[in-house]
Design a protein with these regions (language model features):
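A short, N-terminal "cap"/entry segment at the start of jelly-roll beta-barrel domains
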Residues: 1-32, 67, 114-121
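Conserved short histidine dyad/triad with adjacent acidic residue
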Residues: 20-21, 31-51, 85
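Short beta-strand segments in beta-sandwich/barrel cores
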Residues: 44-46, 62-67, 80, 88
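Glycine- and acidic-residue-biased ligand/ion/polar-headgroup-sensing regions
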Residues: 52-69
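A cytosolic small-molecule/anion-sensing beta-strand core signal
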Residues: 60-61, 76-77, 94
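Short acidic-glycine-tyrosine-enriched beta hairpin
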Residues: 69-85
Length: 121
């Protein structure tokens, strides 16, 4: 079991000394499920990237804003948001640490089962 608070504080310390203003650690990897803590210093932006099939962002510290085509909401400590299913980035409005939860793929057998269940009649 990981202490997310301690991990987030450690990564924020690393981000402050990083030339790129960020630090991250993947703390859970189970099949298609990934969870990582990402720390960013104020003003640091993660460039736009593709979204996995399902993902959420939980802000542990600070404030962030999702960026991209449609813009995005500002999120503050304690808030959780589902990530949009479109290219997006992340901007730290102040020093911040977030937990990214992502499902990176769905096994083919599960996709077939879901597709069959969604097909009428």
């Amino acid at each position: 079991m990981d202490d997310l608070d301690a991990l987030a504080r450690h990564l924020l310390d690393e981000a402050r000394t990083s030339a790129h203003g960020r630090s991250a650690h993947l703390f859970l990897h189970d099949g298609p499920l990934r969870q990582a803590v990402i720390a960013l210093t104020a003003g640091t932006e993660l460039d736009e990237h593709n979204t996995p099939p399902a993902a959420s962002l939980h802000v542990l510290y600070g404030r962030v804003r999702l960026t991209g085509q449609g813009g995005g909401p500002e999120l503050k400590a304690g808030q959780v948001a589902m990530l949009p299913r479109e290219r997006h980035g992340l901007l730290a409005l102040e020093n911040a640490a977030v937990v990214l939860t992502a499902v990176t793929g769905v096994p083919l057998s599960e996709r077939r089962t879901a597709a069959a269940a969604a097909t009428p009649g």
